[in-house]
Amino acid sequence: MRALQLMIDGGKRGVAEASLGSANVLYLALKQLEHQYLVDEGERQHTFLAIEEPEAHLHPHLQRLIYRNYLRTREESKAPPEVRSILLTTHSPNVASVAPISNVVVLRRSSGENHTVGRSLSGVEFDNEDRLDLERYIDVTRGELFFSKGVILVEGDAERFLLPTLAKLHDPDLDFDALGISVCSIGGTNFAPYVRLLGPSGLDIPFAVLTDFDPKGEEVSQEDADPDDNGVGKSFGENRVVNQIMQHLMTPTAWNGKTFKQVLTAATAHGVFLNDFTFEVDLFKADTEDEFAATIKGLTSNKKMHERFDELSADPNILDPKQFLKDIESVGKGRFAQRLASIFLAGGSDVCPPYIVSALDYMKAKLA
């Protein structure tokens, strides 16, 4: 044998012609083999491997594929015990989205201080179902919450699409990208694991929760407890705030001895904001009946639906919430919200419902 050449891309080209991303991956693979060889030969027992910005020059799919393997937990792997510890420092939500929750450490500037603090999730006791839910939840889009200066948790896509627009129209300085605020939809009403993730015992990232009142008798998520279970809450939303969210935000000393009403009253001071009905209904009641009618007409050719929204535009007081929400759901809440946001932007008016204004004021104060 006179020459030995390592080929890549199915043998089409040599290593010298590799892209920077491919070269980085090859280098890491060779380093891993080297460390394993040293252990096998008894020259080393353990290796501590630090990788700075591993996402460099790799497209998103490869980032997730490669580092899912690097970051796998002992339980997920049938391989023998690891002979190395890996530290990744990253700005990539793709890498963050495949990291086990218990392995995450977030470094952030301490509010009002001139130093950096590290927050780890290793000490937060999530039950197995909540942990798995969170790891599934934190996809590439939501993975940005690890890098956020502030987070607003909402129930669905309608709020996620509309909130940045409503905030900017309310106050031009409320540019979420400039402020580092992420709006994260939890896709339901089970806020508890996410409150624990972001709260004082978790990452301690400033956050607010926006949730619906959902009066008794309305169709709501099956994640919610029935208000009649304890005979106290007037709605699913009130029960959700007190029994599911606030118990994770108040200290045991502050929680003990408090009545349901006292805890509910304290919610806004902890960044939890409840509307009067549901997001779409509250937004409609902020003098936006014409914008809602224009949105429906732009998304569907259903004449009866057009007539209903024309009637609402002429007299908003005749609103039937059930039919109203049914019509919006028929075209898709997310699609409706995106079109409505563009109409709001074209109009340029401040149409922010009061509970959202309160949440925005809360976030501004936290990030000041």
Q: How should each PLM-predicted stretch be described?
A:
Residues Q5-T141, K168, F344-A368:
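Switch/communication elements of ASCE P-loop NTPase nucleotide-binding domains
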